[in-house]
Curated annotation (Swiss-Prot):
GO annotation, biological process: glutaminyl-tRNAGln biosynthesis via transamidation; mitochondrial translation
UniProt-reported outcome of changing F136L: In COXPD41; uncertain significance
Catalytic activity: L-glutamyl-tRNA(Gln) + L-glutamine + ATP + H2O = L-glutaminyl-tRNA(Gln) + L-glutamate + ADP + phosphate + H(+)
Assembly mode: Subunit of the heterotrimeric GatCAB amidotransferase (AdT) complex, composed of A (QRSL1), B (GATB) and C (GATC) subunits.
Enzyme's top EC category: ligase
Gene coding for it: GATB
Protein's UniProt name: Glutamyl-tRNA(Gln) amidotransferase subunit B, mitochondrial
UniProt note on tissues of expression: Predominantly expressed in tissues characterized by high rates of oxidative phosphorylation (OxPhos), including muscle and heart.
Superkingdom of the organism of origin: Eukaryota
Length: 557
């Protein structure tokens, strides 16, 4: 039976940032031996009582979890890394394969300039040092969807090294505090993608599609500075937003444009690092968090029961919610790395090293690319907070949901309502409806202009808040009516006749003398009860602000 999930302190999952309670994920985890030999701070993990064959008592020691990531992002380019074949998702099988992609003898690689520029741009955005000279290598292994028997990558000297990624972790019971956390980036390297193996169980066949073979990849190696699934998922989501903002990768995990391998180990604080396992090909942020948390708990259970952790590769079964062994790595695989003989060193320049009279089309200028960097998500969040006075966690949510920031900005442009009111309606009402029906922003039946018109009606006190929600429900039905038409048809306008409201308030006061007495006796709830009675008599069409003013005047408050 699968081991129970570990109860982490950072349980409340949000797309934009992780929740951390009790400090269990506030400290950095120690790195595994896979990507760094430095010892960092450790994060303790709450332990559940387990049966064990060891002599130590249960709960005597805490556990520290260590998580590192290898992220493969498919570069947004018209052609592949070393050939002129097109890159297009869902093309017919083997319809985008050049002679080089199929590894026919005599074919040679030609480096794609766009892929190099994308790697430099990504490295700069992630605070990396860009190597002016980088090298290509062959990584040998046999698999059916790798026709050459090797992959061209950058093992010795990658294009970018020593960067950092800052992401936000939301802490506290009300999620009101965003704590910045940093994960180091070991390197970014250019490499080829492999083809796809398609398994036909009905015919007991494995079919090969080479359309993806040779597509340019950015491999981003994150040092093991994370300590739970939520931290890893949040870091990957932030990287995804950065890649999309840069335009260097669409980073659509559903289409395999962003794939993650997680290296995970556990140990007692102050003791040597544990044996790590690698969970491969995680293609969803939600599954990434689940797989890491499960694997951490599985390792703890195994060690508490007197077992040992194998250095192995595992996969995540999303239906069962557990990791499963694929192959062990005890006999370390020899990839026989060697320099790529058909590619010279990749040489880049900056403003100081650029040769005089160099053709801009023949060289890549690092400083020139730096000047073209677009606004990054962190800067956008700061602007949202400063310009609209919203909470930082709200800015995370706006950026995190695809298309939501653009929707919000379009509403802001078309309405007179205050930004805080727009923020509340977009993040609470609008986003809530989307989540209930599992819709993307682009699939919403409510347009920015319709919501803007509704907020204008509310802001001008033409309708009440309850009526506005009723109008929104009608808009969601896709009947093609405007908010103004709905208000008119259902007679939802607030009563503006001062004389009629005064008469109505007088009638309610006469009908409820005890409530009037309570108001005069300074009962704070009594005035609200009177307001409610008046609004009930008008089917909620009376403006509560006007009612309160009239009642206070009549009662001499």
């Amino acid at each position: 039976m699968a081991a129970p999930m570990l109860r982490w302190g950072c349980r409340g999952r949000r797309w934009a940032f992780a929740r951390v309670d009790g400090g269990s994920c506030h400290r950095r985890g120690a790195p595994t031996g896979s990507t760094s030999n430095q010892i960092r701070g450790e994060s303790s993990v709450a332990q559940q009582p387990l049966h064990t064959a060891q002599k130590t008592r249960k709960g005597e020691h805490k556990w520290a979890a260590v998580v590192g990531l290898e992220i493969h992002a498919q570069i947004s380019s018209n052609s592949k890394l070393f050939s002129g074949s097109q890159v297009r998702f869902s093309a017919p099988p083997n319809s985008l394969v050049s002679f080089f992609d199929a590894s026919l003898p005599g074919t040679l690689p030609v480096l794609n300039r766009r892929c190099v520029e994308a790697a430099v741009m990504t490295g700069l955005a992630l605070n990396c040092h860009i190597n002016k000279k980088s090298l290509f290598d062959r990584k040998h292994y046999f698999y059916a969807d790798l026709p050459a028997g090797y992959q061209i990558t950058q093992q010795r000297l990658p294009i970018a090294v020593n960067g950092s990624l800052i992401y936000g972790v939301c802490a506290g019971k009300k999620q009101s505090q965003v704590i910045p956390k940093t994960v180091r980036i070991k390197q970014i390297q250019l490499e080829q993608d492999s083809g796809k193996s398609l398994h036909d169980n009905l015919r007991s066949q494995t079919l090969i599609d080479l359309n993806r073979a040779g597509v340019g990849l950015l491999e981003v190696v994150l040092e093991p500075d994370m300590s739970c699934g939520e931290e890893a998922a949040t870091a990957v989501r932030e990287l995804q937003l950065i890649l999309q903002a840069l335009g260097t990768s669409q980073a659509n995990m559903a289409e395999g444009q962003l794939r993650v391998d997680a290296n995970i180990s556990v140990h007692h604080p102050g003791e040597p690092l544990g044996v790590r396992t690698e969970v491969k090909n995680l293609n969803s942020i939600r599954f990434l968090a689940k797989a890491i948390d499960y694997e951490i708990q599985r390792q703890i259970n195994e060690l508490e029961n007197g077992g040992e952790i194998l250095n192995e590769t595992r996969s995540f079964h999303h239906k069962l919610g557990c990791t499963m062994s694929m192959r062990d790595k005890e006999g370390k695989q020899d990839y026989r790395f060697m320099p790529e003989p058909n590619l010279p060193p990749l040489v880049l320049y900056d403003a100081t090293s650029l040769p005089a009279g160099a053709d801009p089309q023949q060289v890549i200028n690092i400083d020139q690319i730096r000047e073209t960097l677009p606004e990054l998500p962190s800067v956008t969040r700061e602007k949202l907070v400063q310009q609209y006075g919203m909470l930082l966690e709200h800015s995370f949510t706006l950026l995190n949901e695809v298309g939501l920031l653009e929707f919000f900005q379009n509403v802001i442009k078309e309405t007179r309502a205050e930004p805080k009111k727009v923020t509340s309606w977009v993040l609470n009402t609008f986003l809530g409806y989307l989540k209930q029906q599992n819709l993307a922003v682009s699939e919403s039946p409510v347009t920015p202009s319709a919501l803007a018109e509704l907020l204008d009606l509310l802001d001008s006190r033409t309708i009440s808040s309850s009526a506005a929600k009723q109008v929104f429900e009608e808009l969601w039905k896709r009947e093609g009516k405007t908010p103004g038409q709905i208000v008119s048809e259902k007679q939802l306008e607030l009563m503006q006749d001062q004389g009629a409201l005064e008469q109505l308030c007088h009638s309610v006061m006469e009908a409820h003398p005890q409530v009037v007495m309570d108001v005069k006796n300074r009962n704070p709830r009594a005035i609200n009860k009177l307001i409610g009675l008046v609004r009930k008599a008008t089917q909620s069409r009376a403006d509560p602000v006007m009612i309160k003013e009239i009642l206070e005047k009549k009662l001499s408050l």
